[in-house]
Design a protein with these regions (language model features):
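Surface-exposed helix-capping loop/turn segments at secondary-structure junctions
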Residues: 37-42, 121-129, 164-165
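Terminal targeting/low-complexity segments that flank the catalytic cores of oxidoreductases
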Residues: 1-26
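Acidic/histidine-rich alpha-helical segments that form the ligand environment
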Residues: 23-27, 32, 90-129, 148
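Short, contiguous alpha-helical
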Residues: 1-2, 44-88, 129-165
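Amphipathic, non-membrane alpha-helical segments in soluble helical-bundle scaffolds
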Residues: 17-28, 51-58, 99-106, 141-145
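A glycine-rich, hydrophobic loop/mini-helix early in the fold
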Residues: 26-52
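Non-transmembrane alpha-helical segments in soluble domains
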Residues: 21, 32, 55-58, 62, ...
């Protein structure tokens, strides 16, 4: 989780957590449109063995939205909890998203984005400054919120690339 991504150019480091929800929802709509635009023959195909297929990026984003909301809940409910780092490659491989129904995944992704947005809108005053340690790195709720937005923005480019969109 970084405030600025040199790979995709994302920099919303000055965006308050309360403003992330609506922006995240707009970006998630772009993700859904991009997934639906990928030709079916490319949707489940990995362009390279270590590069996810577009449907795997969607599955990862579905997981990621729930994980970000859970992180925020932990940071607000506990006094600086410690959370182990997760390996997204392992979770994507275990989930076998290439065999999943794309419309089911899109629906789940949409619901998780909406839940995260609602959760961000309902944060009590001062909650954006609450923090936790992810792996060995302390992060705030504000950074976690922006990271969810970044995940969607960044992987939107990944989804568009294989389909030539």
């Amino acid at each position: 989780m970084e405030d600025v991504c040199t790979e995709c150019g994302f920099d919303q480091s000055s965006t308050p957590a309360a403003d992330v929800g609506p922006a995240l929802e707009r970006t998630a709509t772009e993700v859904a449109d991009a997934v639906r635009s990928v030709p079916l023959e490319l949707l489940r195909r990995r362009p390279e063995p270590r590069t996810w297929a577009p449907i795997e990026y969607l599955g990862h984003l579905r997981e990621s939205m729930a994980f970000h909301r859970w992180l925020i809940e932990q940071a607000v409910a506990q006094d600086h909890p410690e959370v182990p780092m997760v390996d997204p490659d392992e979770s994507v491989a275990a989930a076998d998203y290439r065999g999943a129904d794309v419309e089911d995944l899109l629906g789940q992704f949409h619901r998780r984005v909406m839940r995260l947005g609602a959760h961000l809108a309902a944060l009590p005053p001062g909650a954006a400054a609450c923090s936790l340690t992810l792996g060995d790195r302390p992060i705030t709720v504000a950074l976690i919120a922006r990271s969810a937005w970044h995940e969607c923005h960044h992987h939107l480019g990944d989804i568009r690339r294989p389909g030539g969109l």
